[in-house]
């Protein structure tokens, strides 16, 4: 099983998000391969859900396109099988609590283990609700990656950090996912509090879409997570592999401190 902390060892990590089955099964496989080849360090694969409470319009629309392709959780596992035939890039799932519950905690974790899906991000499962799932994931070596919001106080940060695995996902701004022109949260202070509570890497997501933003976040955190901007490229370019490669290379250069150009 991939140790997710290793993706942050040598440089600032670029983490991209795609929705499984958007616009179709084969295209998603090609997208993940393109991201991997261009320098992406980790891909979050979103399992389509009917009520994605953390996601903005861009990702909601992608979920609907995936549903049109009859993408189910089992079909997502089949998609990862196809991905694993072409790349060993680290993978995690972004999913919602009901999907994992309906599938069965142990069965879901076993599937993840067999495909080297190293972690889960479950936005609608707060720390207090994770007690039953967490031991099962620990047993199978699957990280439950927590989200920490700007509103989290010191005690909550410490409690979340104590149970965290893999890395900490810092939510840059309140609200749902989506690109933001300006991120005004005092992220430096928030990340400093997290670092006081844990040695796990910290990645910032929600709203990041331009290389200049990625470069700024790299001064604070160990990596950036880009979701809506990647999903938008997929929605507006078919096939999207070339534009995803270009975008990933530009973000990679920015994270490495080589440029801070913008994306149209």
From Swiss-Prot:
InterPro entries: Aldolase_TIM, RibuloseP-bd_barrel, Trp_synthase_alpha_AS, Trp_synthase_suA. Pathway: Amino-acid biosynthesis; L-tryptophan biosynthesis; L-tryptophan from chorismate: step 5/5. The active site is at 44 (proton acceptor), 55 (proton acceptor). Gene3D superfamilies: Aldolase class I (3.20.20.70). It catalyses: (1S,2R)-1-C-(indol-3-yl)glycerol 3-phosphate + L-serine = D-glyceraldehyde 3-phosphate + L-tryptophan + H2O. Pfam families: Trp_syntA (PF00290). SUPFAM superfamilies: Ribulose-phoshate binding barrel (SSF51366). Keywords: Amino-acid biosynthesis, Aromatic amino acid biosynthesis, Lyase, Tryptophan biosynthesis. It is an enzyme of class 4 (lyase). Belongs to the TrpA family. Tetramer of two alpha and two beta chains. The alpha subunit is responsible for the aldol cleavage of indoleglycerol phosphate to indole and glyceraldehyde 3-phosphate. HAMAP family: Trp_synth_alpha. This is Tryptophan synthase alpha chain. It comes from Lactiplantibacillus plantarum (strain ATCC BAA-793 / NCIMB 8826 / WCFS1).
């Amino acid at each position: 099983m991939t140790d997710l902390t290793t993706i942050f060892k040598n440089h600032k990590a670029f983490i991209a998000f795609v929705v499984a089955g958007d616009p179709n099964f084969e295209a998603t496989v090609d997208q993940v391969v393109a991201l991997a080849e261009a320098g992406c360090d980790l891909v979050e694969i979103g399992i389509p859900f009917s009520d994605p409470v953390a996601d903005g319009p861009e990702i909601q629309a992608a979920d609907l396109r995936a549903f049109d392709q009859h993408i189910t959780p089992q079909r997502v596992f089949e998609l990862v099988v196809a991905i694993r035939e072409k790349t060993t890039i680290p993978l995690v799932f972004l999913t919602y609590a009901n999907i994992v519950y309906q599938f069965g905690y142990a069965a879901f974790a076993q599937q993840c283990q067999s495909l080297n899906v190293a972690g889960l991000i479950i936005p609608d499962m707060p720390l207090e609700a994770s007690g039953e799932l967490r031991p099962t994931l620990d047993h199978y070596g699957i990280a439950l990656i927590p989200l920490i919001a700007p509103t989290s106080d010191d005690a909550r940060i410490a409690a979340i950090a104590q149970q965290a695995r893999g890395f900490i996902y810092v939510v840059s701004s309140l609200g749902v996912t989506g690109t933001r022109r300006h991120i005004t949260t005092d992220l430096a202070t928030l990340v400093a509090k997290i670092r006081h509570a844990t040695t796990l890497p910290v990645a910032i997501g929600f709203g990041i879409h331009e290389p200049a933003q990625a470069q700024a976040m790299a001064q604070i955190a160990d990596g950036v997570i880009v979701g809506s901007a990647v999903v938008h490229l997929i929605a507006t370019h078919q096939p999207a592999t070339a534009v995803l490669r270009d975008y990933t290379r530009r973000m990679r250069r920015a994270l490495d401190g080589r440029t801070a150009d913008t994306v149209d």
